[in-house]
Amino acid sequence: MANLEESFPRGGTRKIHKPEKAFQQSVEQDNLFDISTEEGSTKRKKSQKGPAKTKKLKIEKRESSKSAREKFEILSVESLCEGMRILGCVKEVNELELVISLPNGLQGFVQVTEICDAYTKKLNEQVTQEQPLKDLLHLPELFSPGMLVRCVVSSLGITDRGKKSVKLSLNPKNVNRVLSAEALKPGMLLTGTVSSLEDHGYLVDIGVDGTRAFLPLLKAQEYIRQKNKGAKLKVGQYLNCIVEKVKGNGGVVSLSVGHSEVSTAIATEQQSWNLNNLLPGLVVKAQVQKVTPFGLTLNFLTFFTGVVDFMHLDPKKAGTYFSNQAVRACILCVHPRTRVVHLSLRPIFLQPGRPLTRLSCQNLGAVLDDVPVQGFFKKAGATFRLKDGVLAYARLSHLSDSKNVFNPEAFKPGNTHKCRIIDYSQMDELALLSLRTSIIEAQYLRYHDIEPGAVVKGTVLTIKSYGMLVKVGEQMRGLVPPMHLADILMKNPEKKYHIGDEVKCRVLLCDPEAKKLMMTLKKTLIESKLPVITCYADAKPGLQTHGFIIRVKDYGCIVKFYNNVQGLVPKHELSTEYIPDPERVFYTGQVVKVVVLNCEPSKERMLLSFKLSSDPEPKKEPAGHSQKKGKAINIGQLVDVKVLEKTKDGLEVAVLPHNIRAFLPTSHLSDHVANGPLLHHWLQAGDILHRVLCLSQSEGRVLLCRKPALVSTVEGGQDPKNFSEIHPGMLLIGFVKSIKDYGVFIQFPSGLSGLAPKAIMSDKFVTSTSDHFVEGQTVAAKVTNVDEEKQRMLLSLRLSDCGLGDLAITSLLLLNQCLEELQGVRSLMSNRDSVLIQTLAEMTPGMFLDLVVQEVLEDGSVVFSGGPVPDLVLKASRYHRAGQEVESGQKKKVVILNVDLLKLEVHVSLHQDLVNRKARKLRKGSEHQAIVQHLEKSFAIASLVETGHLAAFSLTSHLNDTFRFDSEKLQVGQGVSLTLKTTEPGVTGLLLAVEGPAAKRTMRPTQKDSETVDEDEEVDPALTVGTIKKHTLSIGDMVTGTVKSIKPTHVVVTLEDGIIGCIHASHILDDVPEGTSPTTKLKVGKTVTARVIGGRDMKTFKYLPISHPRFVRTIPELSVRPSELEDGHTALNTHSVSPMEKIKQYQAGQTVTCFLKKYNVVKKWLEVEIAPDIRGRIPLLLTSLSFKVLKHPDKKFRVGQALRATVVGPDSSKTLLCLSLTGPHKLEEGEVAMGRVVKVTPNEGLTVSFPFGKIGTVSIFHMSDSYSETPLEDFVPQKVVRCYILSTADNVLTLSLRSSRTNPETKSKVEDPEINSIQDIKEGQLLRGYVGSIQPHGVFFRLGPSVVGLARYSHVSQHSPSKKALYNKHLPEGKLLTARVLRLNHQKNLVELSFLPGDTGKPDVLSASLEGQLTKQEERKTEAEERDQKGEKKNQKRNEKKNQKGQEEVEMPSKEKQQPQKPQAQKRGGRECRESGSEQERVSKKPKKAGLSEEDDSLVDVYYREGKEEAEETNVLPKEKQTKPAEAPRLQLSSGFAWNVGLDSLTPALPPLAESSDSEEDEKPHQATIKKSKKERELEKQKAEKELSRIEEALMDPGRQPESADDFDRLVLSSPNSSILWLQYMAFHLQATEIEKARAVAERALKTISFREEQEKLNVWVALLNLENMYGSQESLTKVFERAVQYNEPLKVFLHLADIYAKSEKFQEAGELYNRMLKRFRQEKAVWIKYGAFLLRRSQAAASHRVLQRALECLPSKEHVDVIAKFAQLEFQLGDAERAKAIFENTLSTYPKRTDVWSVYIDMTIKHGSQKDVRDIFERVIHLSLAPKRMKFFFKRYLDYEKQHGTEKDVQAVKAKALEYVEAKSSVLED
């Protein structure tokens, strides 16, 4: 009874006085209508008491407003209290505690002992046993970031650092303590933890005394499978549960954790919730009670009121909330003291059990300048708007460094501040900021920011025995161990360091996850200038650095660096002198300087030395040096040289500045073998070369080298100067000096040399050393063996031994170097006098040229002329001819692939993918499929499949990687996988890329003949299997054969001797009815007689006549037309006519019969065949005038279907016919045609494209017969439109989309007539149009496509703004208005117009919002005039009183509430103004007087909608009893009023504005209006409700189709788990060819759809697979597939991908996938059956039979019958019916009582067999010895069959047999 009273307080609302009010709040907390009641009572008091009580009422109203504002105060640590229940989100999971994100940017902590009692008990057991328990999970295994949890505040305290700390508990005993056993009801959503595992389920601790909660195993299976990865639930596991059954008055409850039940759980009145036991996380249905600047007030569960602060509004709906709006909300918390219920409208909280998404932390710690304030909240903090539009929040404590200097005035909206992002709140999805100077200037904000080895400053906090604690940031502390307090060990560190001292430290180790920071104060380490080692990869041989000794052993010292990197100094490397006992010389903690000898990062091993090598001595000059001392050149010296002359082998040069002669061999000009001869060719006498290396001097001859690799080696000091420095394992850079049969000799820059034996020259088998290397080639060599006595060394050149680091980086460096050298050659060429050479130097790959075909060579390549200069050789290889028919003199557009700078040839391509390159933004590091287009010796050029961009990639990834077997060599046309390293072509014209694994290469199909298969041609495999036998058939021969397979457009026939023949669909019937499929007339296995009419060439699959010399090696083309089978038929073609000639014979307008081959989704056309060698295309727009057909052409057209088409003409290649199904394609005036939108131009109209390249334009005046505010809103690129052609002048189509034009039969009402000239206008006429522009003398107003009128300012508005610029703001271009024609001047072609309300009958075009822009003087003047005219003395007195106190009032429940929010109303857009204007027109038909602005009514509309107006104050509003705001009637708005006070325009708690008096005076005209009668108000109320209902029904109409991305966003927001909506959204983008957006939608869907909705997610995965298969690369498809397998049941994903491959006719890929499936899922019968069906569809019956045998071997015996029956069924449908019968018969002979098999056998025979066969089976089955129930089933089927197909006699016969069976059974029973 107590609960009942609590939920339903007795009695009505009553007036309360000040003393009672406080009492009521503390005692009768459940009456949540206190705010509304106060307002209502205040209003009644006002009307009853009159002016005498005004002052008292205003005080009460002000306190009420303050109380309302306090309810919206967001949570702070101070407002929390112990026992408060609150919804939280797991932010971090540590070993011993959880960090919980709470609403409004708060944070709390849950100790490991606060999970549940059972878990704590297990922990105690583990501690007692001192051994880990197997069934006890750690916190990271029980909780994951993002989980929503219900918490209770257990304590509020202060940490050691002086910070406020919130301790929370998840223990159900504490969270659900407010529930009693009697209060439990079915459907309640509770949280609990698993307390124990039972035989049939789990006991769950829900924390309710006297209640035992049980979760049946069956109900937990779905959760275990989806959430627990199949593992059983463990003690302590947190669950969201639904109460399913309640027994024994709550003593026992049965729970469910199913996803569907939990995610849709709603708290209802039937569950008897009250304020004491409302739990956070409950989802409730609510109704908006009030819309305020601080948030929303909601009614829910009938009697409760809650608040939604600005942080928890739905971001996508903010600004659209209105009173009485129905919403769903989630309870965040109920404050135990104030009893305020905090709610959230964020969609992610409205699905219980769904985890929150983790926010990106990439900007965490960023310092931001000039961040504008969005709003300020007194007791909470301030909101800010970041540059990317994201909302951010700073708590009050973070707005200044101290409370003393805090100034609230600095946080007015618009003020800017410098701040830093310190955290992200997952619960609020916003960034948390700090304005504290100490935090902004802090060197580090979090542990993640600190790198090992960094020098940091800190403050000493304390000194303990374990070390010194140092504060290095606001929330970070580090430890300095005792060993690191100084360079030497300190006994009394407290004497040197004191608490508060600032110290400089160097970071030794930082572990952000464990929040562990170790530092050192050793001076030598801190001040060291040597490089630091933070990982083993940093340790390069020869590197000198500082470290510290951590252990001294007898075998040496272990030295440690940073980040736990350490190495060993062996005993012999401790000193140059022998040290017998290291422990006496060295000590732990000693700082030492070491040099790295060797490092193996993979094994984390490092060898160090204390013996530091001194600088090498300078090289002595050779004894016989002939140069003077002052002019000596040292070996290894870098010099500049001048070319003197060229020789055969190199360049004679002079070393500058002393002109010492030297020789530079050709092979030493570059590291790239191919570039040496190129540089040698273009260098000439006088050229200067820089940075040339002196290699050797002998007999006065200086040998030079210009190889960059060798130059870098010498500069870096990595070249050993003498043999003593050589040791095994060293990696050196040198060049091939000579090549022998037994190996190659390698020389190094210093003159040292070694032998690389044949055995270790390469990882590949070496047959000939000269195949692998050439003299002078740059190589990397690893020393394997050293003979110090003979000073010889053995080297390895194997790639596995000579790794130079990351292969991708090396590959890119080699490519960069090669291209830079080529660019240098171009520079040399540009200095030549020849115009040809200069032109070649300027040409780069990717450039486009318009050329003329000069000659087609025998090899199929094409030579072009017409280049930029004469004599320029431009060639396209046969491959780059792209199968095009070219003739001399033809003009072609080509793209340059490469310029051969040695042969002076330009390689070009005709490939359309390259010529029509797509402009798409590329990402660095992205992977792409590419096709090799050109090969050079060092690099290859490939084109990206998606865009056609040209990219270069190196053919080698190592200096030694020069040998390739033939099978490894790339070929032109081959597919490769590339990773882009640049996104812009640069000076080379090429993108730079690195090739992926060789396994991703794909081979191109070989085409040995110049006649190539059409790019869209798909060859029947039946015509390509095996070798085509030579035959002796000739024209006119009659042959007999058996139908082998049937395809949509042809039938394959097997003739005698295994010869394969083909019958085209056009040669089956003489008269083909439209819509039929002729090939279906023939059945597989049927014997046919045909006549030979031609043949198909096996190489090109092109049709050949009999007379062709290659006819004997062709597939005979046959005909079974009755007319051609007649004797004496001689009309056969015996001479050769090419398809191009045949196509010329077709005339435009001619009607032909064609056969649909397929619908090309990508290119949007139907591919058809007219004859075996004549193909055609029908653009989608020419298939129908019906939008339904164009939207789903696959439903209208079937493959193989015969179509009647009209010839349009040959296409551009002259090899195909263009056809139309809509009659002759003539774009002439008066015609109606279908087009596709290609561009939408704001305020102008559309650009529409038609088939075959025609373009037209549609003006905004021709979009519809009725103009609209947003005429272009429904149009997006790629949308299909029905157009009427107005004119075709100047080859530009002028179009109209008006229904009266495109569908005149509908007799569409023309609201806005067409205005094409001034002749169409009459004086006095009312016309609508669009604002054109604002000019000094008036407003130009567009009345038609070419007609513009002028409205002078005196005829624009009754208002006269002081600034004319305000017209631009309030009359934007394109705004729809109504105007009256005042005067026409036909001579000057001038139309004068008026917008005034008196002329148009419409509201003033300058809305109330403009009034706010006028100066205060103008407002006062206008108001004074109104007061004089109307003489409202009473109103004047009232306004004077209000003006005196206006400054004190913040918000009033009646009219006074408008005052502080007036500026907000002024800021609203034109849309609200227009709505209010149209509203006034409906409600009050009297025209306004000039002095009355629309702002008054606008404000009335707004604030009445917010429940803050009195009905008696305006004639617009009806009079009604004020019960509660939810019952206030709505105005008749044309569309739902949008509350525009969203996150962008929140009014914070600022001092009230000074316009109160003005606001009050604005309302006077309303107070003076005549009151309406009660009947009028009731009628008006009914109209308003009907109008609102109509709008709501329209918005809720499930049949309403989305037409924009915003529509789809709304839909998926309302139904986030509906895959159908997501797929429609993807299809919407695909129709607009927005592939990336479609991908993004799919990825968004996968993130949004709940993981419990497995099927919905799978649907999206399948759609994404389809998308990648159709528009992506094989690599992108594979990646998506691998992800899909990871997140779904693998078998389903495999089967879906196989179907996708099969449907897209990628049969090879499908076959390979099926074989993978057979290995992985051999026990799944579905895989075998699907593979069998696939093979049968491909006419591979024999392979299908083998699959059946394999299936029977792999599958268990119990599955055999089902599999055999299914294969037999497939044989019936797709293969040989006779074989199917045999399989069924064999199966039924073994299993005669398998009635399911009998039933399938009967079904198949009915479909594919004869009536005799069916009756035979029925006769057999009704004589079987089966159960009577089964027999009844078969008798019934037999009877139904005879009724449908038999005679009355047959029916009676079946009945007689049934009766006979019944009698026989009865007699047996009687016996």
Swiss-Prot record:
Cellular compartment(s): Nucleus, Nucleolus
GO biological process: rRNA processing
Keywords carried by this UniProt record: Acetylation, Isopeptide bond, Nucleus, Phosphoprotein, Repeat, rRNA processing, Ubl conjugation
Composition bias, Basic residues: 43-59
Keyword Acetylation attributed: yes
Region listing for Disordered, in residue ranges: 1-62, 998-1018, 1395-1531, 1549-1586
Positions bearing N-acetylalanine: A2
A single MF term (Gene Ontology): NF-kappaB binding
Modified sites of kind Phosphoserine: S7, S438, S1360, S1362, S1476, S1493, S1498
InterPro entries reported for this sequence: HAT, NA-bd_OB-fold, Rrp5, Rrp5_S1_rpt_hs11_sc8, Rrp5_S1_rpt_hs1_sc1, S1_domain, Suf, TPR-like_helical_dom_sf
Pfam families xref list: S1, S1_RRP5, Suf
Disulfide links within the chain: none
Main localization category: nucleus
Annotated Gene Ontology cellular component terms: cytosol; nucleolus; nucleoplasm; nucleus; small-subunit processome
Biased composition (Basic and acidic residues): 1416-1459, 1469-1484, 1575-1586
Superkingdom of this protein's organism: Eukaryota
Domain called S1 motif: residue spans: 83-171, 187-258, 281-346, 365-436, 453-522, 542-611, 636-707, 729-798, 1036-1109, 1149-1222, 1230-1298, 1324-1396
Gene3D superfamilies: Nucleic acid-binding proteins, Tetratricopeptide repeat domain
Location in chain, cross-link Glycyl lysine isopeptide (Lys-Gly) (interchain with G-Cter in SUMO1): K1030
Known role: Essential for the generation of mature 18S rRNA, specifically necessary for cleavages at sites A0, 1 and 2 of the 47S precursor. Directly interacts with U3 snoRNA. Involved in the biogenesis of rRNA.
Complex formation: Interacts with NF-kappa-B p50/NFKB1 and NF-kappa-B p65/RELA.
Official protein name in the record: Protein RRP5 homolog
